[in-house]
Amino acid sequence: MSSDFEGYEQDFAVLTAEITSKIARVPRLPPDEKKQMVANVEKQLEEAKELLEQMDLEVREIPPQSRGMYSNRMRSYKQEMGKLETDFKRSRIAYSDEVRNELLGDDGNSSENQRAHLLDNTERLERSSRRLEAGYQIAVETEQIGQEMLENLSHDREKIQRARERLRETDANLGKSSRILTGMLRRIIQNRILLVILGIIVVITILMAITFSVRRH
């Protein structure tokens, strides 16, 4: 499990390093190369998102007691991903302004105003994205807590079942002991009755012997 996560981590590190390098190169490229580079970065950003999803799935499969470290790493990677997307958006805005100026011949003031407006919208989107990410993280943590509670309940249920089994075994043993004691008492009573009968027979025999002896004399 952790080996798969670490493999995705390495792929993510290599990919984000490439994306960072390409984003930094975009402003310095000729228009044709910029267009190709922007398309390439978009594709790699999607690949990075897929890697994050795979890593997130791997973290959910890790036992709760070992999950904390991986969850912290995931938060760091998501923040890094958010920064890359922000840098790329700014790079695209600059690229779009440049293309628009070339096609429409807009003056510098209009371009600056539009760029400022786009940057403002971008910042709003980033804030919304951070709120969504925070909500998602809360949902994930809530799910983890729920899973831990379910596991604890499952352990408690197993303990209760084992206790019930022990009680059943104890009841069964008590039942056997009770039957054995009852049998022993019955045999003791029978033996005492036999002794009493034998004693009576002996007394009667002695009395009869004495009676016969007296009559002969």
UniProtKB/Swiss-Prot annotation:
One of its GO terms (cellular component) is endosome. It is found in: Cytoplasmic vesicle; Golgi apparatus membrane. One of its GO terms (biological process) is autophagy. It is a single-pass type IV membrane protein. Its main location: cytoplasm. It holds the Pfam family V-SNARE. Residues 1-192 are cytoplasmic. SMART domains: t_SNARE. SUPFAM superfamilies: SNARE fusion complex, t-snare proteins. The keyword DNA-binding does not apply. Interacts with distinct SNARE complexes that contain either STX5 or STX6. Interacts with NAPA and, to a lesser extent, with NAPG. Identified in a complex containing STX6, STX12, VAMP4 and VTI1A. V-SNARE that mediates vesicle transport pathways through interactions with t-SNAREs on the target membrane. These interactions are proposed to mediate aspects of the specificity of vesicle trafficking and to promote fusion of the lipid bilayers. Involved in vesicular transport from the late endosomes to the trans-Golgi network. Along with VAMP7, involved in an non-conventional RAB1-dependent traffic route to the cell surface used by KCNIP1 and KCND2. May be involved in increased cytokine secretion associated with cellular senescence. Belongs to the VTI1 family. This is Vesicle transport through interaction with t-SNAREs homolog 1A. The gene is VTI1A.
